[in-house]
């Protein structure tokens, strides 16, 4: 929520475009109508082929160590991924006086229905609601059959869904909604009650992770990673390098050409990189990785610390 002054009068707003822009200054590209970074769909599609660890590494080495949370249940246990642009919302327990304030703000902004409906009703294509329900499960069931159906119809995302630090209900109905994966904390038959919105498209905490509006949500491997919007392009490139190095590394280990210790080193030798380049150019399995820039890796191999024995992340 943002607080503004207008002609001496204090105005409070939910989902304020200027606040979203102020929270994400490192994003230099196109923005959505609400101010969130509009990460290109080609990167969302590229993430489908990557694993959690491949995507996590480029973020972690840059100091983003609070982007992952794994303490969830999933609506489906079939390995499907959740990928999209984050819409964040934060809630707190019911308090009568603040409830009046929050609802007055919502009415002034043309919002109708319950606090969770405010978010679902305004979703756009490829949006993923990221919801801090303060781990409330009993009477904290943010999604059920109806809202999950509405979510799917709004977002039109074959890898769509939601992340909820709270509860859900009607899971049998939810599972029938196509192309939808939901990460949640628990199930309860009670309808949602006694909660109030405190923030909409602002900084949101999900367990041990921090999510900003417009982050790319990557749910895979049993947990959720929030990728800062301005790093997505770099993350996709870095993850692709990890992917082809793994492909090559498994081959070399199987052929006894290198040991696991050599493959797992943080910095590869020039000899290993030369063989990797040859593998990329000649092996059809590596065709999609051709044309990538490996100058940084060669620089480390030639000028880096020869005693660096640290294993790769």
Where would I find each of the regions flagged by the language model?
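Short, Lys/Arg-enriched N-terminal segments with co-localized hydrophobic residues
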Residues: 1-11
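A broadly tuned, weak detector of single residues within folded domains
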Residues: 4-6, 28, 144
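Short acidic, Pro/Gly- and aromatic-enriched capping/linker segments at domain boundaries
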Residues: 12-30, 42-44
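Feature captures the catalytic cores and cofactor-binding loops of soluble hydro-lyases/lyases
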Residues: 31, 38-41, 45-213, 226-275, ...
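Short acidic-glycine loop/turn motifs at beta-strand connectors
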Residues: 33, 220-221
């Amino acid at each position: 929520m943002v607080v503004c002054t207008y002609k001496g009068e204090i105005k409070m707003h939910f989902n304020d475009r200027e606040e979203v822009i102020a929270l994400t200054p490192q994003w230099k590209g196109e923005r959505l109508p609400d101010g969130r970074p509009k990460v290109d769909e080609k990167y969302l599609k590229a993430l489908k082929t990557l694993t959690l660890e491949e995507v996590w590494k480029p973020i972690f080495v840059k100091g983003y160590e609070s982007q992952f949370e794994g303490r969830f249940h999933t609506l489906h246990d079939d390995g499907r991924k959740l990928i999209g642009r984050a819409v964040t919302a934060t809630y707190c327990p019911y308090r009568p006086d603040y409830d009046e304030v929050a609802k007055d703000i919502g009415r002034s902004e043309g919002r109708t229905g319950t606090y969770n409906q405010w978010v679902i009703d305004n979703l756009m294509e490829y949006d993923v609601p990221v919801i801090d329900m303060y781990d409330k499960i009993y009477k904290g069931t943010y999604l059920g059959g109806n809202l999950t159906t509405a979510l799917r119809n709004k977002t039109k995302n074959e890898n769509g869904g939601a992340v909820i630090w709270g509860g859900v209900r009607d899971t049998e109905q939810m599972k029938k909604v196509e192309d939808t994966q939901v990460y949640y904390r628990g199930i309860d038959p009670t309808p949602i009650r006694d909660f109030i919105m405190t923030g909409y498209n602002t900084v949101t905490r999900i367990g041990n992770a921090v999510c900003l509006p417009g982050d790319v949500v990557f749910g895979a491997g049993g947990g959720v990673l929030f990728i800062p919007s301005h790093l997505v392009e770099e993350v996709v490139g870095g993850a692709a390098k990890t992917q082809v190095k793994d492909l090559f590394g498994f081959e070399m280990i199987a052929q006894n050409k290198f040991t696991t210790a050599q493959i797992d080193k943080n910095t590869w030798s020039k000899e290993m990189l030369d063989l990797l380049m040859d593998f990329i150019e000649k092996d059809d399995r590596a065709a999609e990785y051709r044309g990538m820039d490996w100058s940084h890796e060669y620089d480390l191999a030639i000028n880096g610390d020869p005693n660096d024995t640290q294993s790769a992340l």
